Amino acid sequence: ACLGQWDSCDPKASKCCPNYACEWKYPWCRYKLF
């Protein structure tokens, strides 16, 4: 399963869902607006 909005993640090994990205500032996945 992939990680969705606000799910905690590791920037070095992001497991976020498609169209989501692991933030560096805060260790969670956020929707990419681009």
From Swiss-Prot:
Keyword list, A-Z: Amidation, Disulfide bond, Ion channel impairing toxin, Knottin, Neurotoxin, Pharmaceutical, Secreted, Toxin, Voltage-gated sodium channel impairing toxin
Gene Ontology annotations for the cellular component aspect, listed alphabetically: extracellular region
Tissue: Expressed by the venom gland.
Effect of substituting residue 1 to Q: When modified in pyroglutamic acid; weak change in ability to inhibit Nav1.7/SCN9A
Localization of this protein: Secreted
Domain characteristics, as noted in the entry: The presence of a 'disulfide through disulfide knot' structurally defines this protein as a knottin.
Similarity-based family: Belongs to the neurotoxin 10 (Hwtx-1) family.
Annotated function: Voltage-gated sodium channel inhibitor. It is unclear if it selectively inhibits Nav1.7/SCN9A or shows similar potency on all sodium channels tested. According to Escoubas et al., 2006 and Nicolas et al., 2019, it is selective over Nav1.7/SCN9A (90% inhibition at 1 uM), versus Nav1.4 and Nav1.6 (35% inhibition), and shows a small inhibition on all other sodium channels (except Nav1.8/SCN10A).
Further remark: Synthesis and folding of this linear peptide generates 4 peaks. Only the peak 1 shows a strong activity against Nav1.7/SCN9A. When analyzed in details, this peak shows two forms (P1' and P1''), which may be explained by the involvement of at least one Pro residue in a cis-trans isomerization.
Protein name (Swiss-Prot/TrEMBL): Mu-theraphotoxin-Pspp1
